[in-house]
Amino acid sequence: ILAAKLIKDQGIEVIGICFKSYFFNEENAKRMCKQIDMPLEVVDFSEEHFEMVKDPKHGRGKNMNPCIDCHAMMMRYSGELLKKFDADFIITGEVLNQRPMSQNRQALNTVKKESGFSEKILRPLCALNLEPTEMELNGLVDREKLLKISGRSRKTQMELAEKWNIVDYPSPAGGCKLTEPGYAIRLSDLLDNQETVAKDEIEVLKYGRHMRISPKNKVIVARNGEEWKEIVKFKKEDDILVTSKNSTGAPVILRGEFNKEDLETAARICGRYCKEKDSDAVEINYEKNGEI
């Protein structure tokens, strides 16, 4: 948003591009664009993005986040939109060395190269640390009005936000679930144990505890009533619902191929999290397709 404002202040029309996937959405972008009166185009690249997440060419960060491959994909999609909007170039808010893996000089160059639009990418916030682009050399953009931010500190960015009265902006991670350790563990487990994964199976990872009983099955346990309202939306026809007969404790979903031993394990997990957990015994119900 700061990069967009910087270019807008040169009298250049700017259109926001936001990407939507299984792991992040457009809500932050919508709020930010309103603050600088910038139109927004939302691009849903969920399927292609997910295929990349499974096997990123340039590896991952601390968790499941393939930032270099992700940025390159975003730049490619943005480049393909240039003609649609009769636009001249792409700007991004990247800052040299702000992130050790994905925003070092080599990574920034990799993103440009693999995007297929390397000559059309401008990084206004750190442009003075980089070689001039064709947009600067031909006078389309005034290089002297661009910035030289580098490093991990966000002090300069926060000062700019205050100066421009931009008060609603996201945390540095930007709302990407792939950067969250707990979510990353659940996604990694899913990919390690299933050859094919459906959208609903990815969505439900955002909620509850996911416990692998065997390579062929797992249980999902809600932490509270609000989580259960979300989890139950993704319940499959073949799932087993495991509940305590005499309490309103946490329901458990058993998913996958299972045997009697797995059912008993799911029952013990249900007993562990229900309100009767301190009792000598907990009576358990198994429900499938509405039948107990």
Predicted regions and their residues:
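ATP-dependent adenylation/nucleotidyltransferase module used to activate substrates
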Residues: 1-163
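AMP-forming adenylation/ATP pyrophosphatase catalytic core
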Residues: 118-292
